[in-house]
């Protein structure tokens, strides 16, 4: 449906919301860049956790929209429910367990549907409110 890099660029804002409580310093850094160039207007120092993640994610999607880049998986021609199912199945593959464990918010395979499922649904629709934080 799309290249790995393109998929990562679409997914980054959604994972920023999920990981936000664990990566606040990084979000403030990158958020400052988005703010400097007008993609974020909020005072990042007044925000924390999920709220900070949502504001930075909105800055990311504002930039993407400005350059005509997709911000939702549903904007990719040919994207279907099967792609979500395959992604969730791949994330639960025991051979990839170390990838789950090395994320800013470590997961185990039994948590994939509970946490990654809503991230993918949010990325399909563009609705950050669907993301469930740990």
Label for each model-derived stretch:
Residues 1-59:
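Active-site segments that bind and position negatively charged phosphate/pyrophosphate groups
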Residues 34-134:
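C-terminal charged capping/lid subdomain of soluble metabolic enzymes
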